[in-house]
Curated annotation (Swiss-Prot):
Gene: HUB2
Keywords: Chromatin regulator, Coiled coil, Flowering, Metal-binding, Nucleus, Transferase, Ubl conjugation, Ubl conjugation pathway, Zinc, Zinc-finger
UniProt similarity note: Belongs to the BRE1 family.
Coiled coil: 1-38, 160-240, 290-604, 640-670
Phenotype on disruption: Semi-dwarf plants, early heading, and partial sterility of spikelets due to defects in the anther developmental program and pollen formation.
Protein name: E3 ubiquitin-protein ligase BRE1-like 2
Annotated pathway: Protein modification; protein ubiquitination
Zinc fingers, RING-type class: 792-831
Subunit structure comment from the entry: Interacts with HUB1.
Compartment(s): Nucleus
Organism: Oryza sativa subsp. japonica (Rice)
Length: 844
């Protein structure tokens, strides 16, 4: 074949390929359009199906919440369409297939398909209608229950009937709560099932992602192999092109002429090239087919991923759906009711705790009183101990004086030593007594600290009582405002009732004041005469228009009369209703007054308890202050005692030193006597020694006298301390007497306040009676004024019977007849002229 023919064939093939490509592009565009339409249809179907399923879920859950059966929860199990069933279904029927949840479309003809569609739609519609009917029935049952319960509570039933109704309602509520719990458990199971499915989808997704990665690796390997095959093809083409050139150039260079086998070699080369190109094309087509398959697999996998993500989103939608939110709201409502009941129980427990606290406070008060009494007894015992100690000290002083006199009388050395020993023993005893006093002062200080702690505790109790009093006063103020508002309502209702009674009385009087038959006949005769006269005047003056106006006025008056009668009936009904309301309000006022009396009594008792607490607190504060002063005095006394103890210790040390010195002097004197006896000294030296000893004795006697004076000073101080203690005891007794007097005064004041309260009550009752009398007088005055308004303004005796149509003023008929007899007729009220035709009778 020639190259031109091959080129021509190649051009034709290229044109055919381009035409096929254009057709393929057009078909792909149409396919994309159809696919977009299918996607839009699918989206609308998904939205519609979700809305329908949501409606069914709402109906089911509302029915369960309204107290219906749990059988409707089966409707929550919506059947999901599998992808295999959708792939097996034709594209024209996917919409209906998804909408009606049917699997029979793919095996039916066009004639039976419409019937199946209608049947499926009717089935789904019937299920929704049955759910709606069951929900309406549940609402009706709940409404009937609530109405019966409200009638039982608001009606005049006995307490036993009300208790039975409440128990029935509680049983019903328990059943509803059990149903809700079962429904919640079922929904939780479904939720767990969906979670398991989600986990399975996630596992499948991870597995498919792994497969996609493997396929992408295989695809890359196949692409690499394709590139290698293309490279080999290009190399083969180059080799074939180079070999042909070598074959053509070699014979030309060697022989210098073209060989005869040139055409055959070319034909063989072109055939080999064609075969190689065809093989390469087949390989490329196979590779392209494999590529398309892998791309389609990737698209399928991506669709599956999108579907799984949509399903995951649907799971999130389940969590945020209306049924789930309704059930969560129901749970919150039930939790709120449980918390409310818990709050009531806590309030009752708090009241119980408050009562227990009050009892504990009363016990604490009694214990504090007992502690105060015990402290008083302990102080009395301490005072007695101090008196005994003073007596002992006085006796010791007397003993010391006697001993001093005996020491002055006796000048012997042995007696002096014995006296010194006795003095040392007495000083040791006094030191022990001082130690005991120090221990007692420490005990008193510890008791003072305990009393301070008790005072702090009582202050906290007082603050709590003040807060409770404030709360009670706030409650009392709120109740007083409610009582005032109720009294204002009662006053307004009383006024309306009185007005309505007044109107009823007026209308009754108007109805009762019917004229006699003779007066009616006279009025009829007069009316006939007036009619004849009017006819004559109308015939003379052609006053047909005025007659029409009169007829219209008569019809208007009749209409007004009918309206007034209807208003009368309405007013009577209102009067009856107001009387009922007044009775109810009176009963409520009585209940509120009883509650107010109870609250007032409680407030009085609390006020009295508060005053008692204040007095006790003041008394305790005074006691604490006295204890503090006494403790300060004890501390100062202890300091002084410590100082005295130190001085006594110093004196004791001095005395011990003196004793040692005396002992040493005695030993020296003995030695001197022995030495004098041995050396036979003169008596002058002995006399000097005796004089020196006498001097020492005089010094020791002076020191003993000083010690006696110090002891006398201490006795005086102790006497002054006992006197101050006695004075404090007398002051405490006086304070106790004053507190008793204050208690008696407070009791008298309380009695006076109760008497004043009774007087105020009597005054309030008198004032209420006076206000009722004044209101009755006002109403009587208003009745008189209204009667005066209904009477004629000229004679003030007869009722108003006639109307002047020009000015619409009302008068009695005799007064108007007098004016009609006069030529210049004028209205007595405003002075406007009128004629006989302007006068009309009116029934009031």
């Amino acid at each position: 074949m020639d190259a031109a023919a091959l080129q021509y064939e190649n051009q034709k093939l290229v044109q055919q390929l381009e035409a096929q490509k254009s057709k393929m592009r057009a078909l792909e565009g149409k396919f994309k359009e159809l696919r977009d339409e299918q996607c839009s249809y699918d989206n609308t179907l998904i939205c519609l199906n979700k809305m329908w399923n949501q409606l069914i879920d709402d109906l089911v859950l509302l029915g369960v919440r309204a107290g219906g059966d749990l059988n409707g929860l089966q409707a929550l199990d919506h059947e999901e369409m599998s992808e295999e069933s959708l792939e097996s279904c034709p594209s024209e029927e996917i919409f209906l297939f998804r909408l009606l949840n049917s699997r029979n479309f793919r095996n039916n003809d066009d004639s039976s398909l419409s019937k199946l569609v209608e049947e499926a739609l009717a089935l789904r519609y019937s299920t929704t209608v049955t759910l709606m009917k069951s929900l309406q029935e549940a609402f009706a049952v709940q409404q009937a229950r609530s109405e019966s319960l409200s009638l039982a509570l608001n009606g005049q039933n006995s307490s036993e009937d009300v208790i039975v109704a409440l128990e029935n309602h509680n049983d019903y509520l328990k059943e509803v709560v059990d149903n809700l719990r079962q429904a919640v458990s079922i929904i939780n199971r479904k939720h767990e099932k969906y979670l398991d499915e989600i986990e399975a989808f996630k596992n499948n997704q991870s597995r498919e992602l792994h497969e996609v990665k493997c396929l992408s690796g295989e695809l890359e390997e196949s692409m690499a192999e394709l590139e290698e095959s293309r490279r080999k093809l290009a190399v083969l083409q180059l080799q074939t092109g180079g070999g042909s050139l070598m074959n053509t150039s070699a014979p030309n260079g060697v022989n210098g002429s073209v060989s005869t086998d040139k055409s055959s070699d070319k034909g063989m080369g072109w055939r080999d090239l064609k075969d190689a190109v065809e093989e390469a094309k087949t390989l490329a087509a196979n590779r392209l087919f494999e590529l398309h398959e892998t791309q389609e697999d990737n698209l399928i996998l991506s669709k599956q991923l999108e579907d799984i993500q949509d399903q995951l989103k649907d799971e999130n939608y389940i969590v945020t759906s209306k049924p789930y939110t309704i059930l969560s709201d129901q749970l919150h409502h039930l939790n709120a009711e449980i918390e409310r009941y818990r709050g009531l129980v806590e309030v009752l427990q708090n009241e119980k705790d408050q009562l227990m606290q009050k009892e504990e406070e009363m016990l604490a008060k009694a214990e504090s009183v007992d502690a105060v009494q015990q402290s008083i007894t302990t102080y009395k015992a301490k005072i007695e101990d101090l008196e005994h100690e003073i007596q002992k000290l006085m006796a010791e002083k007397n003993d010391l004086e006697i001993k001093a006199e005996e020491a002055l009388q006796d000048s012997g050395k042995k007696d002096f030593k014995d006296e010194i020993h006795v003095m040392a023993a007495s000083l040791s005893k006094e030191m022990e007594l001082l130690d005991n006093q120090m221990n007692r002062s420490k005990d008193a200080a510890s008791e003072a600290l305990a009393l301070r702690e008790e005072a702090d505790y009582l202050r906290t109790l007082l603050a709590k009582k003040i807060d409770e009093q404030k709360e009670i006063s706030d409650r009392y103020n709120t109740q007083v405002t409610e009582i005032k508002s109720l009294k204002a309502l009662i006053e307004t209702l009383d006024q309306e009732k009185q007005e309505l009674q007044f109107i009823v009385d007026m209308l009754g009087k108007e109805c009762s004041e019917s004229r006699a038959i003779s007066e009616i006949e006279e009025s009829e005769n007069r009316a006939r005469k007036q009619a004849e006269y009017l006819r004559k005047c109308l015939e003379e003056h052609n006053l047909e228009l005025r007659v029409k106006a009169a007829n219209e006025a008569e019809t208007a008056c009749q209409q007004r009369l009918s309206i007034a009668e209807a208003e009368l009936e309405d007013l009577r009904a209102k009067v009856d209703a107001s009387e009922r309301d007044v009775m109810k309000l009176k009963e409520s006022i009585r209940i509120k007054e009883a509650e107010v009396d109870g609250h007032i009594s409680e407030i009085e008792t609390i006020g009295q308890a508060y005053e008692d607490m204040q007095t006790q607190n003041q008394h305790l504060l005074q006691q604490v202050a006295d204890r503090d002063d006494f403790n300060i005095k004890l501390v100062s006394d202890s300091v002084k005692m410590k100082q005295a103890y130190g001085s006594l210790l110093a004196e004791k040390n001095m005395l011990q030193k003196q004793l040692q010195h005396v002992n040493s002097s005695l030993e020296s004197s003995k030695l001197k006597i022995t030495s004098g006896e041995e050396q036979m000294k003169t008596y002058v030296a002995q006399a000097m020694k005796s004089s020196s000893e006498n001097r020492h004795l005089a010094i020791s006697l002076e020191r003993t006298m000083l010690e006696v004076s110090d002891a006398e000073k201490e006795l005086k101080w102790l006497r002054s301390a006992t006197g101050s203690a006695e004075k404090e005891y007398e002051i405490n007794q006086k304070k106790i007497a004053e507190l008793k007097m204050e208690l008696e005064r407070e009791r008298n004041e309380r009695i006076k306040l109760e008497e004043e309260y009774e007087e105020v009550k009597n005054e309030v009752s008198e004032l209420t009676s006076e206000t009722e009398e004044t209101t009755i007088q006002k109403l009587q005055d208003e009745i008189k004024e209204c009667k005066a308004i209904l009477k004629c303004g000229v004679c003030f005796d007869r009722p108003k019977e006639v109307v002047i149509t020009k000015c619409f003023h009302l008068f009695c008929s005799p007064c108007i007849q007098r004016n009609l007899e006069i030529r210049h007729r004028k209205c007595p009220g405003c002075g406007t002229p009128f004629g006989q035709s302007d006068v009309r009778e009116v029934k009031i």
